[in-house]
Amino acid sequence: MKPMDKFKQVRDDDVIRQVEKAKLPDFEDDYFVRRRVTFHGRVQHVGFRLELERMATRLELTGWVKNLEDGGVQAEVQGYESRIRFLLKFMRSLKRIKIETMENKPCSPKQNETEFKII
């Protein structure tokens, strides 16, 4: 295994542990929404997409996350609004990630979406 691959594996294992140990509040199901969120800052090469995907899955949210050519990350997240708010707050709380700007816009929900994926 190359040194960089080893580093990524250690980082990814840490990301998974962080998500698994995070304490989730009791959520009250509220409005079902879909949001397109664009993040800028130190959000690439830090496990951001993996962490967002794992936490979104744990929160029973659907959608996708992808890197942007300008160094940002974009996600569409669908589910109950309180869970999406928690996800965004969780991502802002991570020390190795520095979100400088976050644009959060509503978009139309998608029927039949069943998972959250990294694209």
Descriptions of predicted regions:
Residues 1-119:
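Intrinsically disordered, low-complexity, mixed-charge
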